[in-house]
Each structure stands twice: as C-alpha cells, then as structure tokens.
Amino acid sequence: MNNDPVGSTWKKWDLHVHTPMSIVHNYRRGSPDEVWEAFLRDLEALPPEFKVIGINDYIFIDGYRRVRQAKFEQNRLKNIELILPVIELRLDKFGGVVKKDQDGRDSPSDWNRINLHVIFDALDPEVIQQQFIGALAP
C-alpha cells in the first residue's frame, strides 16, 4: 500500500479533442504540416492543469497515431501526461427509443440519434485498428 502523504490529486482531462485528421475540426488554414504544427502548439499551450487528453476523430485512429508520434518520437507535448484514443460512433437509429405522437402512435423520439464514445487505454493504434475498428460491421 502506498502511504503517500499528499493523498489524491485532481487533474483536468479533456477527452473530446479532434485533430486536423478528424471529419470535424477547426484547423483549416495552411499546408498539412502547418495545420498540424498549429494544432500541436495549441495542445502545448493548454493551461498547466490539463494533463490527459482523449484524441477523438470519429471512427479513425490516424490523428491519435500522429499525436503519439509527436509525444514519443518528437519529444513534444511534455505538458500532457497521458494521451488516450477515443472512437466516436454516431448511430442514426437507436432501437427501442420512441415517443407517442399527437395521435397516440409510436414515433421516433429526440433520442433516435446518439453518439457513443469508446475510450481505450493508451494502446498501440494498430491493436485498436485491427481488433475494434476492423471488427465493426457496416
């Protein structure tokens, strides 16, 4: 048992970070290298209390690969202690969620479209690609 006199420490996490490789992102100006440099600089400029980020690029893992490369091969993102891959799945139908319309009939509810976020341990991206993304059925 660890008898650390400090006890618990609280850190801020942002588990919904979209990279320039995401379908939706805010980095559109410049060459691909310039766009990535701006993105990485923004991550490095996060307030010091942010220690964990989740790279969330829908059903793609390429942005996570690139951020890991910056952290571990280029020695960047020293302010970030942990980078987690997050896969976001958008379901256009969510079974069993209905509401009654004005005539008393079942109709789709406002909850008929939801997003699922699957947060993985900081795994090798190839494991996630092969064992999770590769197993998704169309």
Task: Label the model's feature ranges.
Residues 1-111:
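An N-terminally biased module of ancient metal coordination in phosphate/nucleic-acid-related enzymes
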Residues 91-138:
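Internal, well-ordered alpha/beta segment that forms a basic, Gly-enriched binding/recognition surface
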